[in-house]
Amino acid sequence: DGKSPEGNVKFRILSLSLSEGYKIGTLQEMNLSFSPIVSTGGKLTLEGNDGAEKYANMVYVDLSNNSQIQIKRKSWNLGFYCGDEFRVILNSSYATVAVASEKTDFAAVTLEDAQKAPNIAAGAMSEDFSADWIDDVEGDLTKTAFGMIAENAAENVHQVAAQLPGADNKTNTDETENRSLWYKVKVTRNGEGYRVEYGKVGDTTPKTVEIAKNPIYNFVGLSLESGEKVDAQA
């Protein structure tokens, strides 16, 4: 269940081979108790740099046992909450931003919608940038760009998602903005998990993926670029 093990195991000797000359003594039972390993302190070097780039990994540290987990920073765009609620977060470390399209049909969201949308990829320092395009900077899950994923699938609209300059520089060769590289994404509930349909804004047929909640993690991530899932946050 993702929690540190704690409890006890009882061992009891029921019989021995008399033909071998063994006999059960007065001590027939033994109790083995165990509890989580607690760190007494120390030093830990965070492996955020893989040598190729300075900020390659997101690193999570378990202070109880001096261990760390590295996750490739660019391995996911969206994170799906594994708690009781149905929430989606943006990977701010990969400069992912999103804005609602107000449309529920995949094919209805087109490149024209992206062209008419606010320039969400303008950058946080732009005068036109809106805090509504990113998640709450203090981590409040009730204040995310996607909002709560509604139980009624028809109430969930497509989000137009992009990345800020420098994430992977989503531009044309002449350095002008290329909104055809933006994505459209719709997330609905799928039992106790999620169903995601997504694609480039010009696509007419969506790619779909189902994401199950994993109680060991806070979030399961999805890369819009590769379609791969990743355990995004321990």
Model-derived regions: residue spans:
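Surface-exposed, beta-sheet-biased, low-hydrophobicity segments with strongly acidic/polar composition
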Residues: K3-A234
